[in-house]
Design a protein with these regions (language model features):
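Alpha-helix boundary/N-cap detector
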Residues: 2-9, 141-152, 156, 176-183
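Intrinsically disordered, low-complexity regulatory segments
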Residues: 4-53
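Residue-level detector of alpha-helical secondary structure
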Residues: 8, 12-15, 95, 158, ...
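Long, charged N-terminal interaction/targeting segments
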Residues: 33-171
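Extended, acidic-biased charged interface segments
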Residues: 146, 153-163, 184-200
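Cysteine-cluster motifs in flexible loop/terminal segments that predominantly coordinate metals
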Residues: 188-231
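Long, charge-rich boundary regions
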Residues: 233-235
Length: 235
């Protein structure tokens, strides 16, 4: 079932031509759980601070790749000196495909997405506003002195994703390059949210006239949504 493949391809297209580094997955950096509070007086800078772009998104694909990977477009944490625009993109490759039933599919996708709320690297405080669609990060001065990089942050996230046995591999993409087209990226992220909403809609809503449905456009454009929608209708 093809759902987010076009979104993933668009993310790659936006990165084409820009310098992208592959980082090692580092293990051993502590996770502070719910105690990861960084005051403004303790932070070195904020990724996505001062109304700069601050984006986060997760897309799921069925068996698209088998190796974990951390990619970085822009300066790494020790190289940053002030607030910069920021994006965190996760592409999760699941083994054995995705469920083909609305309820199970939606819950599987949300379970993968919710990992971002439960990873708290010491000195790296993620601030998520679902209403505003923002995901910014406060980075502490002390953590930078201890050597915090995106390798440690990404390593913790990858480890957390793999607590879900359905996950085959994870590609994490961090973007801090001010030259990156964040506006275009935000449009793709909005489209990915519409896809997820359409899955939920197909699961929960009574079948109505497709011509008056607010999600008709995304349903028409995404093959997997059409399959899901008409599969529900036939049950």
């Amino acid at each position: 079932m093809r759902l987010y493949e076009e979104i993933i391809a668009q993310w790659q297209s936006l990165l084409d031509g820009l310098p992208v580094r592959s980082l090692p997955l580092s293990d051993g950096w502590p996770d502070t759980g719910s105690r990861n509070m960084i005051l403004r007086s303790d932070m070195a800078y904020e990724l996505g601070g001062e109304n700069l772009p601050a984006l986060g998104a997760t897309a799921v694909t069925a068996g698209g790749f088998a190796q974990d990977e951390i990619l970085l477009c822009g300066p790494d944490l020790p190289e940053i000196r002030k607030d910069v625009p920021y994006a965190r993109l996760t592409v999760a490759s699941v083994r054995d495909g995705l469920p083909d039933q609305g309820s199970a599919l939606y819950q599987a996708i949300k379970k993968i997405d919710f990992v971002r709320y439960h990873v708290n690297p010491e000195g790296f405080m993620t601030r998520i506003s679902a209403i505003q669609g923002r995901e910014s990060v406060r980075v502490s001065q002390d953590a930078l002195k201890k050597g915090l990089t995106f390798s440690q942050v990404g390593g913790l996230m990858v480890k957390s994703y793999h607590e879900n046995p359905q996950i085959q591999a994870v590609r994490l993409i961090y973007i801090t390059d001010s030259a990156f087209p964040f506006g275009a990226l935000e449009e793709t992220i909005q489209k990915s949210r519409e896809i997820t909403r359409a899955i939920d809609h197909a699961m929960t809503a009574a079948m109505t006239d497709c011509n008056v449905c607010s999600l008709k456009k995304v349903c028409d454009e995404v093959e997997g949504i059409r399959q899901l929608h008409f599969g529900q209708e036939q049950q």
